[in-house]
């Protein structure tokens, strides 16, 4: 996805929406945009330092220089031994103290960023109301007060889905997060910092919850269907703390244009189920993550076998990609698969160093017994005497109010509300409907990819019907 497309799709919306922003809108938006950019700048700065320190501690070339440095000073009398100890202590201190501290700082910046963004978009907005539908299951990430690695699957209606999932996650966690001052005080005193529950999103070949530079690079230059392998995912889960992981199987944000393209493609692929309120799910991230869970739990999976329906799905996805991204170069996804052969250093010193670095024991991964299926719909409530749905031809009016499904942009959601009550009333309110349904994960761990794909497809059929049902049965009470 190019920069212009990314900016229009995720940040400001269409050019028409962008032109509607006047000077007062920009004056109110600018301070908030600067705050968010400040988080991005600090995160990028500390990430650069962290990666540099990790590079000089683990890179084969740097280890070779370290060896040459030691050999040189070993021939210098008196001060040579001091120089060798000085570098060794500096590297050890950076590895054992500075890098873990920077990891905690980066973790804190990511959480404060999400807390601030949640506050800007959902928590303190009078014109934005979130409703959990009747019959929804509660999100539960803990067992015996211990956080569990939890999978959530969700439809994709807006870039604000990321913030909304963070909002639901934070509301479901009893953990108290440090303020910035408390965090700095604990760092200064050298006190142990408690592990915070983590939420990550799996997509674009990354696990993330912050707009990092490497993520933006993938968004701009690579295919959005890029996925991590099951071995890579297992390695991440065993190195990091237990975390909640959210997947958007649709990959792309649902829009009228993509819905029309999907319906046209369905005429050529009658084997593929047609959805009216969703995009057809992509399976790769889901199947590889489930394979990683199975590997962690030592559960043997059934073998895959070829079938016609699976091939039809892949052809459908390929044609959809071609239409949505006409200018995309398919070679971009191949670049990430190529690996540079490591520098081979025939020296026991280097081997010993590498063993010390990689000797960390894998962490215990506690997998939640449930998968949480989250459904999100955004509505704008408008007062009108008549209405027409250009997609389905049937738009219900609720006591003079029309419910319009929307995909709000970041600019639209972070824009502050004016203090005047008249200004608040003049704005059309946004209603967010959320449904949560849980499914047992244990039976799925033995499934092969085909069975997992079918399971996810069935969940999408249910989700499509649910959205249709919510649209018809929603009621607006007026005073």
From Swiss-Prot:
Protein name per UniProt: Protein MUM3
Keyword Ribosomal protein among UniProt keywords: no
Gene (name only): MUM3
Record bears the keyword Glycoprotein: yes
A single GO molecular function term of this UniProt record: acyltransferase activity
Keywords, in A-Z order: Glycoprotein, Membrane, Sporulation, Transmembrane, Transmembrane helix
Subcellular compartments: Membrane
Residues listed as glycosylation sites in the UniProt record: 285
Protein's organism: Saccharomyces cerevisiae (strain ATCC 204508 / S288c) (Baker's yeast)
Ranges annotated as spanning the membrane: 33-49
